[in-house]
């Protein structure tokens, strides 16, 4: 770091960091005034920090850590190292936030609308911030209004001024294939960055979009996209991926005529996208199935408001945390349609829970529930645990079962067939005292229950470790 330059920890991490500082301060019996005196700042500044309303420089983090006699976090060159104090029962309740995957898809889809799109309850996370920077760089007007995001496309998008630095830091840039073909006959996009887990290829997108008259050529640093007249068609997806399904849907949304998409993903973010497009007047049949029939609407110019639905992956995180700590907590606003198989497998392992309430999300489509967890004694399943495209066990939820398996009596067999290397990272659990056998880069055996111990572990280069 250059002398005189202070590196800052920005939102959304500031909120979590503030909560941690408050917990440590309360545990040590230190008042806000006392902490402020120790770090030579004002009590109001400490209050803002604990509410997540003030960014913290690395210097301030060091001063707070010293004043509390507890490291809050440590920063590496490219990563944040988090210290966690274990052996605590969880208590209380938590409300699930809206999904990152749904949010970025809706941001991209807002380019299909010439009017103003207001997306309610948008998650303030880095992936969203990076995509905002990309959209603003090409002329899109993006405004935050509390937790709502207002998006208004310009009359003319200037793709030549795209913020490459932000684009290469997010995988969500690939979601712009579908919308931008309605603006340009030729354009280029940088290769996406972000999550580096597993090998990724543009071929499924190429094969899907070429059915509409689009060509994608991958060069060293960019994708070169060109098209002729866009026409509706029958599209058989090369793989049932979420992003390729979303791109095919967004391509079809403004092409007049009927498009049929087969072997489509029916995952939560895809359904959220379909519900959003319906509010724009696009007719979609088969939502929630693997075959979608879309009647495109060539001209979309309307001011609409839509609420992003909740994140089943975050819900699974809190379910897992409750299970491994044997805690009784309440998890509110869980999108149950995308957790039912996970809950069934957990139930067969011995997990005890009850559903307190059923209701609709703000989009009036997604089914939500409140879940109450109870301390449970688990046994390993005889069958292997593997992920599948929806309605299978969610691919992003499989790693949670590796941690849960350390607390289940017997040997659990986990088959992570989607990613080439993710199962290797499960071996990090050995550092915590877990008993694992890596059969190959896709399969691992975990024997429990294990009394886990504290140690240093490394997370994979992924958004969903």
Feature locations, PLM:
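Helix-turn-helix DNA-binding motif, specifically the short coil turn and the N-cap/start of the second
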Residues: 31, 42, 53
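Residue-level marker of regulatory loop/turn positions in helix-turn-helix DNA-binding domains and
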Residues: 10-14, 53, 310
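Short, structured segments at the rim of ligand-binding sites
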Residues: 23, 43-44, 48, 55-465
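Intrinsically disordered, low-complexity tails and linkers flanking structured cores
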Residues: 1-8, 112-118
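Short basic helix-loop element that most often maps to the first helix and adjoining turn
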Residues: 19-38, 63
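A short, Lys/Arg-rich alpha-helix, primarily the initiator
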Residues: 2-27
């Amino acid at each position: 770091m250059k002398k005189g330059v202070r590196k800052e920890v920005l939102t959304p991490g500031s909120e979590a960091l503030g909560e941690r500082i408050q917990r440590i301060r309360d545990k040590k019996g230190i008042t806000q005034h006392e902490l402020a005196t120790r770090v030579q700042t004002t009590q109001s500044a400490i209050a803002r920090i604990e509410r997540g309303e003030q960014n913290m420089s690395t210097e301030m983090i060091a001063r707070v850590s010293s004043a509390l006699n507890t490291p809050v976090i440590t920063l590496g060159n490219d990563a944040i190292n988090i210290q966690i104090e274990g052996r605590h029962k969880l208590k209380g309740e938590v409300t699930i936030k809206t999904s990152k995957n749904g949010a970025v898809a809706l941001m991209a889809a807002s380019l299909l609308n010439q009017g103003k799109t207001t997306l309610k309850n948008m998650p303030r996370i880095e992936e969203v911030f990076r995509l905002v920077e990309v959209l603003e760089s090409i002329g899109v007007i993006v405004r935050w209004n509390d937790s709502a995001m207002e998006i208004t496309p310009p009359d003319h998008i200037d793709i030549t001024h795209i913020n490459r630095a932000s684009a290469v830091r997010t995988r969500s840039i690939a979601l712009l294939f579908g919308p931008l073909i309605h603006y340009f006959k030729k354009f280029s996009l940088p290769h996406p960055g972000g999550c580096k887990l597993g090998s990724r290829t543009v071929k499924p997108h190429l094969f899907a979009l070429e059915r509409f008259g689009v060509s994608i050529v991958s060069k060293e640093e960019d994708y070169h996209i060109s098209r002729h007249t866009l026409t509706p068609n029958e599209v058989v997806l090369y793989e049932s991926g979420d992003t390729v399904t979303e791109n095919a849907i967004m391509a079809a949304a403004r092409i007049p005529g009927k498009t049929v998409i087969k072997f489509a993903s029916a995952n939560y973010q895809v359904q959220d996208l379909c519900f959003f497009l319906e509010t724009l007047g696009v007719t979609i049949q088969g939502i929630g199935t693997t075959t979608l029939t879309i009647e495109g609407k060539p001209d979309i110019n309307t001011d609409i408001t839509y609420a992003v639905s909740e994140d089943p992956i975050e819900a699974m995180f809190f379910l897992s945390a409750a299970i491994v700590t044997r805690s009784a907590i309440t998890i509110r606003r869980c999108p149950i349609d995308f957790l039912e198989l996970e809950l069934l497998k957990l139930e067969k392992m011995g997990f005890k829970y009850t559903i307190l309430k059923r209701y609709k999300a703000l989009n009036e489509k997604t089914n939500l529930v409140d879940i109450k967890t109870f301390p449970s004694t688990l046994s390993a399943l005889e069958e292997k645990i593997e992920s599948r495209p929806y309605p299978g066990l969610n691919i992003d939820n499989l790693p949670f079962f590796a941690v849960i398996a350390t607390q289940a009596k017997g040997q659990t067999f986990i088959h992570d067939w989607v990613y080439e290397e993710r199962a290797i990272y499960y071996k990090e659990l050995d550092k915590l005292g877990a008993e694992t056998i890596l059969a190959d880069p896709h399969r691992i055996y975990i024997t429990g229950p294990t009394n886990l111990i504290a140690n240093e572990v490394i997370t994979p280069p992924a958004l969903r470790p």
